[in-house]
Design a protein with these regions (language model features):
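Membrane-proximal extracellular/periplasmic loop immediately following the first transmembrane helix
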Residues: 2-54
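Small-residue transmembrane helix packing/gating motifs
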Residues: 5-9, 121-208, 212
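Ordered hydrophobic segments in well-structured contexts
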Residues: 10-14, 43-50, 65-70, 98, ...
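Hydrophobic, Leu/Ile/Phe/Ala-enriched alpha-helical segments that form helix-helix packing faces
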Residues: 26-37, 103, 107, 169, ...
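Short acidic-hydrophobic surface loop/beta-edge motif
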Residues: 51-58, 116-120
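Hydrophobic secondary-structure segments that place a key small or acidic residue at a functional site
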Residues: 62-72, 83-143
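Cytochrome P450 core scaffold surrounding the K-helix E-X-X-R motif
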Residues: 76-81
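Juxtamembrane interface at the cytosolic side of transmembrane helices
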Residues: 213-217
């Protein structure tokens, strides 16, 4: 999971239900920017949360319900509880998932579940890791048509990498503007709620609440 030490290079956006952005639009935007030769492209992780989806342990025949977080990008960016077993998997992994300790206990009776399979959204997924969360949650790779309501842009810190087209580094001070401009260029409406990590990291009290807010709204 991400830490507050890294908050300064992140920009968080929340999209209302009617303004959520399909995963395929995000991938198309990144491809388009790369084709145009733009420097300092952001690393984007986006996700949405659906409550009480059916999940099943196909081996034991146990079933239950869990909140499903569909993720485009890095699982660790969309998960605030720490990892207690296994790994987060790779960005390109479309067959792996992450589950909470509470769900592991409910369906498998233990936490040593990395490598086992769980069924959700009409597909079996191989469990890559387990998070320290007593509630029932599963994180899966997003599908093309999944509407993302939360988006995190990660830019290089100030002084790292090349400078952008305007001659400034996309670091803490320019993260918000860079994210908004990225969406504007690709005809994607900006999120209703916008939090610039440069300011969040300076306010520890607010910063601690951010991971809870972005995964529970």
């Amino acid at each position: 999971a991400w830490t507050m030490r890294d908050a300064g290079c992140h920009v968080f956006m929340y999209f209302g239900e009617g303004d959520a952005v399909e995963k395929q639009l995000i991938t198309h935007a990144l491809d388009s920017e790369q084709e145009q030769g733009r420097n300092m492209l952001p690393e984007i992780t986006a996700w949405s949360r659906a409550k009480r989806l059916k999940v099943m342990n196909p081996g034991l025949g146990r079933s239950g319900e869990a909140d499903c977080i569909a993720v485009y990008g890095l699982m660790e960016m969309a998960s605030y509880p720490r990892l207690i077993g296994g790994t987060y998997g790779y960005r390109s992994d479309q067959d792996g998932c992450l589950i909470s300790s509470g769900l592991a206990m409910e369906l498998f009776g233990g936490l040593d579940v990395a490598g086992k399979y769980i069924w959700c959204r009409q597909k079996p997924y191989k469990i890559r890791g387990v998070t320290d969360d007593s509630s029932h949650v599963i994180l899966l790779p997003a599908k093309d048509k999944d509407a993302m309501r939360y988006m995190m842009f990660t830019y290089a810190r100030s002084g790292e990498g090349r400078t952008g087209e305007e001659g400034t580094s996309h670091g803490m001070e320019t993260g918000k503007a860079a994210a908004v401009n990225f969406l504007y260029r690709n005809e994607i409406k900006s999120g209703k709620v916008l939090v610039d990590g440069a300011y969040v990291s300076a306010a520890a009290g607010l910063g601690v609440c951010i991971p809870l807010w972005i995964t529970s709204v």
